[in-house]
Amino acid sequence: VSDVDYIVESDTPLPTMPNRNPGDIDIKIAEHIFPYLRDGMTLQLGIGGMPNALGSLIAQSDLKDLGMHTELMSDGYLELYKAGKITNKKKTLHRGKGVFSICMGSEELYDFLHQNESILSAPMSYVNNPTVMAELDNFISINSCISMDLYGQICSESSGTRQISGTGGQLDFVTGAYSAA
């Protein structure tokens, strides 16, 4: 503890984030993505209705031995762990451990993470590093977007002049997944 300047103890509960229920379009998109998934893949699922819909499809499927390497761990991953889909057994980096940088979800998710040795919380500079992701065999990054043009270019931050979200790790994960074996 010699490198710590201050320690502040608190018994204030962690903030929770409600799980966004997918809409009909989210479900349709997830159904189009699902056939491309294979046993043993390492997943990064973004945030929103479509990744939640895909997580539900995976939880009810025959897929097995999936891995987790993600910026944001949410209740969608908890559902996959509870269904026995994520084992991290086939990962080529941090085998046996799901890796994440930040977490937001339910109290149940926080309880699951508490002293869970099969989960590794790492700095964002590591988790979001495309060079690190490139070391993961069968790594796939699945994110949602707000809009797409006819060329397939996506926008995941704004709609017209209305800002919806900030720049997250989506580009890092797309680059990392593209570089992965």
Describe each model-derived feature in a short phrase.
Residues 1-181:
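Conserved phosphate- and dinucleotide-binding cores of soluble alpha/beta proteins
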